[in-house]
Amino acid sequence: MNASFDIAAANYDNSFTHTVIGKLQRNLVYRHLRGILEENRIQNILEINCGTGEDAIWLAKQNYTVTATDISPLMVAVAEKKTNLENLNFRQVDINRLPQPFPDEKFDLIFSNFGGLNCLTKTELGQFLKNASGLLTQNGQLVLVIMPKNTLWEQLYFLAKADFKSVFRRKKENVVANVDGENIKTNYFNPKEVTHLASADFRIRLLKPIGFFIPPSYLEPFFRSRPKLVSVLHSLENTAGKHSFLSKYADHYLITLQKK
C-alpha cells in the first residue's frame, strides 16, 4: 500500500489540499476539532495517515505536541519539507503495526483525517480501534474523519453519468478508488459500524457530517469556476453540520470517541 501512496504524494496537495473544495472541507473539520481541543486537556497528539502534513502543521501551530505518521515514506518526506517546528515529529509508521512503534508513549488525542482509515478492512479497523485505546491516556479522545457508504453526491454523480453499476459501489468491500491515477482498495464504513466496532473500548461523543452540501473533491473542475454556487453550498453546509443523522449521506463524517 505504501508504494501506491508514494505515487500520490507528489500531487496530493494540488489535487486536494489547495483546491477550493479541499480547503472548505478541511476548515469544517478544523471548526469541530478546535472545539474538541478547547474542551479537553490535550497536550500530546498522534496523527494517523498524515499525508503531506497539512493537519499536523496546523495542530502544532496551536502549540500541541504532535507525532504525525504515514505509511508512505514519500508522503512523510513531502511533509518534512514544509516545516521545522520543534513540537512536530513526522514518522513512517504502518497503521497495522500499532502500538508497536510507541512502546512507552501515551497520547491525549489520536486523529485521522479524510478517509485514511478507509484503506483498512473491517477487521483491520476493529483492530486499530482496540490498539488506539491502548495508546490513549485516561479519557483520551479519538477523532476520525471517515468516508461512509451512502454519499448522496456520489450516487447522484453516477446517476447523471448513467453509470448505474457504480451508484451503490461504496456498499461493496475492497472498492477500487482512484487516488491521483493510482488504484487503491478502499472500504467504506457508516457511523453505526464504527461505533459498534469501538463499543468495547469507547463511547461516542460527537458525530458531524463533512461534505453533505459541499461536494467531493473529484468535482473540483466543475465547481472551481462557480464561486457563487460554492458560497451557497457552504452556507447550507453550516446548517447541515447541526444534524448528525446526515453523516452517513455526506462525503465524509467526523466522529469523536472517548476512551472508557
Segments from the language model and where they lie:
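A short acidic, Gly/Pro-enriched loop at the edge of an enzyme's catalytic core
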Residues: Q100-L109
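Conserved class I S-adenosyl-L-methionine
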Residues: M1-N40, I42-G51, W58, V143-R170
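A C-terminal cap/extension of S-adenosyl-L-methionine-dependent methyltransferases
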Residues: L206-K260
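Short alpha-helix
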Residues: N183-D201, L207
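A short glycine-rich, Lys/Arg-flanked "PGG" loop and its adjoining helix->strand segment in the class I
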Residues: G126-Q138
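Class I SAM-dependent methyltransferase SAM/SAH-binding core
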Residues: T52-L98
